[in-house]
């Protein structure tokens, strides 16, 4: 697989795909195979390859992932940890949980801190790929199946308000056409200063975009980056 330096990329139009470092060899041989993610069963109807467009799309999907981790943590503590309950009781618990999550009742210090720690490990174990795909392989106005599956209020909460359409894909959460993968020759691994971890790529992109626009704000990513940068400062000391 070819590598490309982050500073060579178009900050507005590059297509970024995240994947586990463990997948590098397989992707180098076979490209990206479309799939339905573990967290999308029952939501996505067809297999796809997901990606984010541009640096802002990259940062927004990271922000949304932190929120998703908060959701997962809260769901376990509110519903999934209870094993000896009936199906009806579990459904009622989950219904109440989703209502409360939509209303923002689970953004506690403990949940946010846990999600930040989870996100750090996730980003350390991932790499970032640049996809050289064309309109033959994706539709910028394709349907976001998660939006059509969920209530608008819940989707808006999960996407942190980064919504421009009620049913179309957003720049931070785009995908290939159904059943379409990405050929290995259209994939490059992104590096910065010879470092390929997604966390290092995130640091550079975040700094670059903040330098351009100091008023740029994120729901959870700002706090995440403050924590990561403070860890880096402590290491230097």
Question: What would you call each of these model-derived segments?
Answer:
Residues 1-50, 57-103:
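ADP-ribose/NAD+-binding catalytic cleft of ART/PARP-like enzymes
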Residues 56-57, 114:
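Short, well-ordered alpha-helical scaffold segment located
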Residues 73, 77-237:
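Active-site and NAD+-binding cores of ADP-ribose-processing enzymes
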């Amino acid at each position: 697989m070819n590598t490309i330096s982050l500073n060579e990329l178009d900050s507005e139009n590059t297509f970024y795909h995240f994947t586990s470092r463990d997948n590098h060899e397989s992707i180098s041989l076979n490209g990206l195979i479309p799939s339905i993610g573990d967290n999308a069963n029952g939501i996505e109807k067809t297999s796809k390859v997901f990606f984010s467009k541009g640096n802002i799309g990259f940062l927004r999907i990271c922000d949304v992932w932190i929120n998703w981790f908060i959701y997962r943590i809260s769901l376990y503590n509110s519903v999934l940890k209870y094993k000896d309950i009936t199906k009806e009781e579990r459904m009622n618990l989950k219904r109440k949980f989703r209502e409360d999550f939509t209303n923002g009742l689970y953004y506690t210090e403990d949940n946010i801190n846990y999600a930040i720690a989870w996100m750090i490990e996730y980003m350390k174990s991932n790499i970032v790929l640049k996809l050289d795909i064309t309109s033959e392989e994706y539709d910028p106005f394709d349907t976001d199946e998660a939006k059509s599956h969920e209530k608008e209020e819940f989707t808006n909460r999960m996407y942190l308000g980064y919504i421009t359409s009620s049913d179309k894909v957003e720049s931070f959460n785009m995908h290939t056409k159904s059943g379409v993968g990405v050929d290995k020759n259209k994939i490059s691994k992104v590096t910065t200063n010879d470092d390929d971890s997604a966390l290092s790529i995130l640091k550079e992109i975040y700094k670059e975009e903040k330098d351009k626009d100091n008023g740029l704000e994120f729901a959870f990513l700002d706090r995440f980056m403050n924590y990561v940068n403070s860890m880096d400062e402590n290491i230097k000391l």
